[in-house]
Design a protein with these regions (language model features):
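Membrane-water interface of alpha-helical transmembrane segments
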Residues: 1-2, 23-30, 82, 86-89, ...
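Internal transmembrane alpha-helix with an interfacial aromatic "cap," most often the third helix
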Residues: 15-64, 100-107, 164-172
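Hydrophobic alpha-helical transmembrane segments of multi-pass membrane proteins
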Residues: 1-21, 33-40, 118-140, 157-160
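Intrinsically disordered, low-complexity N-terminal regions enriched in serine/proline/glycine
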Residues: 4, 13, 17, 67-79, ...
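Extracellular-loop-to-transmembrane junctions of the mid-late helices
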Residues: 69-106, 147-153
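C-terminal transmembrane-bundle signature of multipass membrane proteins
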Residues: 97-174
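Membrane-interfacial loop-to-transmembrane alpha-helix junctions, especially the N-terminal start
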Residues: 1-7, 54-65, 111-124, 173-174
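Long hydrophobic alpha-helices with heptad-repeat/coiled-coil character
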Residues: 60-78, 152-155, 165, 171-174
Length: 174
């Protein structure tokens, strides 16, 4: 979890400092993008580490919602921006949301401490959903003013990131 937060924070720090120092968004955004991509990779590793063998083997059709939503959104995002970056991001979000939906379905049939994983999976799904909506708002309503939907959704994303920590804490309590 620390690696997830650390990478996300470093990517955001670069972006914010560049914006404050030069009054424009970075022209070479791959520095911050590398941090953000790394954070999602660490989130997936955390998902894998927290899941049990039974959860990893659990199959449910509900998890197919992830690619059914993610693939059309990926096509939509690719019409507005860099194709490779959008394919990478959407692919990672599909994988993370697939595992969270599967984990949430598995946690619903568990009892005791195993069912506490649902808080973590709900937190991850909230993060993915807000990221998707944030990207949609960036495509449809560009701009960085305080009145832009992107600004408010970015604030909501920050709230989701903060909420993910106690959700993970509940998942790992013994």
């Amino acid at each position: 979890m620390t690696c997830f937060y650390g990478c996300f924070a470093l990517g955001s720090l670069y972006w914010t400092l560049y914006l404050l120092l030069f009054s424009e968004t970075p022209q070479v955004f791959y520095v911050s993008e590398f941090g953000w991509v790394s954070s999602v990779i660490f989130l997936h590793l955390l998902q894998y580490t927290l899941s049990s063998d039974g959860e990893r083997r659990f199959l449910t059709g509900k998890a197919l919602i992830a690619p059914l939503i993610g693939v059309p959104l990926c096509v939509f995002y690719c019409t507005f921006g860099d194709v490779l970056s959008n394919l990478l991001w959407c692919g990672m979000m599909i994988v993370v949301s697939y595992h969270s939906i599967r984990g949430l379905a598995y946690a619903q049939i568990q009892t005791g401490t195993a069912c506490k994983m649902r808080y973590f999976h709900i937190g991850v799904l909230c993060y993915v959903a807000v990221e998707y909506v944030l990207w949609i708002s960036g495509c449809l309503w560009p701009g960085y003013s305080i009145s832009a939907p992107y600004c408010w959704l970015d604030l909501l994303l920050t709230g989701c990131l903060f909420a993910l920590l106690p959700a993970t804490g509940k998942a790992v309590q013994v």
